[in-house]
C-alpha cells in the first residue's frame, strides 16, 4: 500500500493545434495504491463529508478504512462470508454503516476506537432479502436501505426499522436516493421508471420514464430497441430537483415540484456510469460522470452546460461523493503481474467562481 497526499495537477490531453482544455474544477488530493487485500474484489467505496476518511468494502466481507492525513496503515475489519454491498459514512464522519449480503441483508454500524486502526461494531440489524444500497439523511438520524422490492427506513439510534416503503415499480429496484431533509425519496426500477416519493405518507409524487433509448443515430437493421433503465438517481438537498443516469449514460434532470424536464444529455460514445457517481451540490448543480467513465463533470442546470471536474488515466469502477458534493473518491483497477489491483483517488472540488 502506498499513500500520496497533496494537491496534484490533473492532466488532460488535447489534440495538436487544439485550444487547451478548461482547467478542471477539482484537485486530486490523495492517491492510495493497492487498497485491496490479496485476491479480493472491491465493490464499494465511501468518503466522509470532510474527506478525512475513505473506506472500501470487499466481496470477502472485509472493510478497510484509511485516514490519509495520519499516514497510518488502514483499519481492517468486517464479517467474513458477507460480501460488502455498500458503505456510507454518517455526516459526522465518525459512524460508518455497512450492508453485508449473505442470504439475508445485514446492516451494521461501526465506530472508530482510540486508535485509528481500531473500529468496533456498535449494532446490527437484519433488513431483508437482496438489499444493495445505503443512504443517510443530512443529520445522520435516518438511514435508508434499498432492497429489491422495498426501501427500509432505519432510525440510526436503535437501530430500528421504522418504515418499509413497498415498491410500485413493475420490476426490481436499480437505484435510489434520500434527500438530505429526508422529506423526499427517489427510486428507479428495471422497467425504466423513476419515481419521487413522500416517504412519510408513502405516496408517489411524480413518475418519470427513461425507458426509451436516447443514444444518437440509427440502430443497425434487425436489432430490437435496447432496454434502458436508470442505474443512478439523486435528489437535491431540499428534494426540489431529481436526476438520473441510464445504463446508456444519458443524463436527465427534473423539477420535482412541476414535474418538468430540466435537462437531457445523450452522447453516442457514453456508456453505463460507475456506481455512486451522481450527486447534487448545495447550490443546485449536478456532479455526474464523464462519458468515458474516467472522471466527473459538473452540470449547471440553469445554463444547461457542463464543465470537467476531474479526470484520470483509468476508468472509474465505483465512486463515492460527499453529501455536499464538495469531494469525491473513485476506485480504479488494473492487472499487475497477473493479479487484480485496486487503487483509490480522492478529489476535492474548488470553490465556485460564479463564472
Language model features with spans:
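Bacterial N-terminal signal peptides
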Residues: 4-14
Amino acid at each position: 500500500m502506498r499513500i500520496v497526499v497533496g494537491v496534484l495537477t490533473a492532466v488532460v490531453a488535447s489534440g495538436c493545434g487544439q485550444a487547451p482544455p478548461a482547467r478542471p474544477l477539482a484537485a486530486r488530493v490523495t492517491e492510495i495504491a493497492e487498497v485491496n487485500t490479496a485476491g479480493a474484489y472491491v465493490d464499494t467505496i465511501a468518503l466522509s463529508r470532510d474527506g478525512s476518511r475513505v473506506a472500501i468494502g470487499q466481496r470477502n466481507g472485509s472493510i478497510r478504512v484509511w485516514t490519509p492525513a495520519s499516514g497510518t496503515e488502514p483499519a481492517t475489519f468486517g464479517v467474513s462470508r458477507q460480501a460488502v454491498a455498500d458503505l456510507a459514512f454518517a455526516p459526522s464522519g465518525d459512524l460508518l454503516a455497512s450492508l453485508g449480503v449473505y442470504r439475508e441483508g445485514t446492516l451494521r454500524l461501526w465506530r472508530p476506537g482510540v486508535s485509528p486502526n481500531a473500529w468496533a461494531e456498535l449494532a446490527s440489524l437484519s433488513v431483508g432479502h437482496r438489499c444493495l444500497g445505503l443512504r443517510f439523511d443530512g443529520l445522520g438520524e435516518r438511514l435508508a436501505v434499498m432492497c429489491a422490492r422495498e426501501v427500509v427506513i432505519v432510525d440510526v439510534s436503535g437501530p430500528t426499522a421504522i418504515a418499509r416503503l413497498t415498491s410500485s415499480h413493475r420490476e426490481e429496484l436499480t437505484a435510489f436516493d434520500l434527500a438530505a431533509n429526508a422529506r423526499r425519496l427517489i427510486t428507479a426500477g428495471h422497467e425504466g421508471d423513476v419515481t419521487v416519493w413522500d416517504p412519510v405518507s408513502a405516496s408517489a409524487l411524480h413518475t418519470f420514464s427513461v425507458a426509451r433509448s436516447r443514444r444518437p443515430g440509427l440502430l443497425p437493421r434487425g436489432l430490437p430497441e435496447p432496454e434502458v433503465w436508470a442505474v443512478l438517481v439523486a435528489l437535491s438537498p431540499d428534494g426540489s430537483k431529481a436526476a438520473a443516469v441510464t445504463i446508456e449514460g444519458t443524463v436527465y434532470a427534473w423539477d420535482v415540484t412541476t414535474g418538468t424536464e430540466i435537462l437531457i444529455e445523450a452522447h453516442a460514445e457514453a456508456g453505463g456510469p460507475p456506481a455512486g457517481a451522481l450527486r447534487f451540490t448545495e447550490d443546485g448543480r449536478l456532479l455526474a460522470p464523464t462519458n468515458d467513465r474516467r472522471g466527473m463533470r459538473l452540470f449547471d442546470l440553469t445554463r444547461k452546460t457542463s464543465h470537467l471536474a476531474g479526470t484520470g488515466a483509468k476508468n472509474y469502477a465505483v465512486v463515492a461523493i460527499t453529501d455536499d458534493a464538495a469531494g469525491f473518491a473513485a476506485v480504479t483497477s488494473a492487472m499487475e503481474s497477473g493479479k487484480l489491483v485496486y487503487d483509490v483517488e480522492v478529489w476535492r472540488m474548488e470553490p465556485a467562481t460564479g463564472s
